Amino acid sequence: MLLKIKAFFLWLTTPLQKFLQQVGNQEALMTSDQVDRCIQLIEPGDILLSYESGRPTSVFIKGYYDHAALVTAKKSVIEAVGDYYIKNPRGTKKNFGGVRQVDLEAWLFKKDSVCIIRPVYDLDKHKVDHNKIASRSVFFYEGLGYDYTFKFGNETIYCSELVYASYKKNDSMFMHHIPENKEILPNDYYTACFESKRSDMFFQIIYEARNG
């Protein structure tokens, strides 16, 4: 019942979320040294968490980090955002946000804080490279619309769900410690570095730059 009430509230506030996504722009805090360090360390399949103090929509998201994205096989970033942007790759006339590919360096410079998280798999137990597979699978979702209701299983997708879906395609146990009836938030990937109990993989913080 509580989940239905929450879903209804998020649906009800969708116009407000869309408006807030467009306002709230202020100068980001990531430095050139921090961005260079990130670029040196980042690998395909890495999960990027970020925080932007100028995002009023952050009030809808629990935890410090308010956004999650995935590093692609091309070393670009694919993310699901609520911002308006030009030309939906799937050809709809009007785009109210969704999944897009952006340049890694440009993405980093827009942030106040960034955390790089890497799912590390035991290669003796896994015969495939899940990180590389996820970094390719994520392209399947490019052009999908943004999910303002934060619900699994519909035709739209939100930021941390995009990361989840890209890994879940080939790793059925990915983020299995999160209850199925709970939405996955950006900060869940951060806490997974300390709370995940799997014996065949773990989540590792590769680098973190907190400026706000």
Report residues per predicted region.
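Residues that form generic nucleotide/phosphate-binding pockets
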Residues: 15, 41, 136-140, 192
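Alpha-helix initiation/capping motif
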Residues: 28-34, 129, 158-159, 185
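Activation targets extended, charge/polar-rich intrinsically disordered C-terminal tails
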Residues: 2-17, 149-212
